[in-house]
Every structure is written in structure tokens, then in C-alpha cells.
């Protein structure tokens, strides 16, 4: 495969991933904005209350400022999903937490749960943010696409010298999902993860039901 063709294929996979994440990204932003709206409405009611001496209203205004700053941070985080910052670094633990939360936006409807085992040495390992986010979230989405029905997803980190491994496995669960499982947009597979991994020079392997991503640990 020519390099240009490989880039086109990788970009096509990235588009599929973003389409799948659209609901989670929207819910993330709406949750932050609804908090601001709620505080603003409470503050307005306090201002209409003649018995209020103004102190509680000032408290609500201060809370709105805090909520707005949190919303700004969330917006920046969402923008990074759309256009990753070149050379940005994150920890494996942080990346896993963000990716599982975002990819698992509809897991309650699928009766799917994730169990994360992240020892401190692995969780604190610094790795490329763009590679980690892209590969972890794509791996999780591929697991749910390839294993319809309720799942128990195991995510395990392990420090391996100058690299850190992330192992993912999906096990069928006996929990009954409230709704029938369905694939959003297009199904992703391990071959899609492997193609993106090659674009980031990340080693990826598969042994039976277990998939492994090996990230290079970056200097602090």
C-alpha cells in the first residue's frame, strides 16, 4: 500500500471514530452548559427574592464563573479530539479514563461495563496524547462493534521498561441490555486499530480475545 493510500485509509477510520463519538462529545458539552444554565436560573430567582441580602446571589455568580471555566476546559478538550495538538503528552491513566468515558456514552443501554486495572507505574507513564486517545478509543469501539450484546470490558495497564502496555479484552456478560445492540455508523475492527497504530508507530498485537497496544514512554 502506497503511503498516500495508507493516509487516506487512516483518515477514513478517524472520520468513522468521530461519527461514533459524536453523541458522547455532545453530551459532554451539554452537561457543562446545563450546569451554567441551572446556576444562572437559581441566581435569577435569588435576585427576585426581596428577602435576599445579596450574599447568596454573589455566591451563585461565583459558582457560575467556576462552571464557565470548567466548560471552557471541556471545550478545549473536545477541540483536541477534532484537531490533536502536535507533540502533546498525557498519562496512560488519564487517556484511558477519558476514552472509556467517551466511548461508553451509551453503555448503560447496552448493559456494558468496563473494569480498569491501572497500577500507578503504568497509569503515570507519559505517552503521546494524540496516539493514546486515537488508539485507545478506537480499540474500545472496535471491541463493542465486534462483540454485540452486553459486555464486561477489561482494560489493564502494565509498565514494560521504556514502554507501557495496554491490554483490552471483551467478555460476554449475562446482563440483559434495555435495548437491542446496534452498530453506530460503520463497524470497526482490529485491522482498523492496526492501521492507525502503524501511523503512530505504536506496536499492536492480538492474542485470541486479548488486544495489546504498546506505547513508548516519553521523558518527563
Please tell me what each predicted stretch does.
Residues 2-3, 7-10, 14-17, 21, ...:
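Histidine phosphotransfer helical core of two-component systems
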Residues 19-42, 126-154, 186-200:
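Conserved ATP-binding N-box helix of the HATPase_c
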Residues 39-42, 56-113:
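Conserved DHp (HisKA) dimerization/phosphotransfer helix of two-component histidine kinases, i.e.
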Residues 85, 89, 124-129:
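Hydrophobic coiled-coil of the DHp/HisKA dimerization-phosphotransfer domain
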Residues 113-124, 160:
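Conserved catalytic submotifs in the C-terminal HATPase_c
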Residues 159-194, 218:
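Glycine-rich/acidic phosphate-handling loop/turn and adjacent ATP-lid/helix
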Residues 198-213:
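Glycine-rich ATP-binding loops of the HATPase_c
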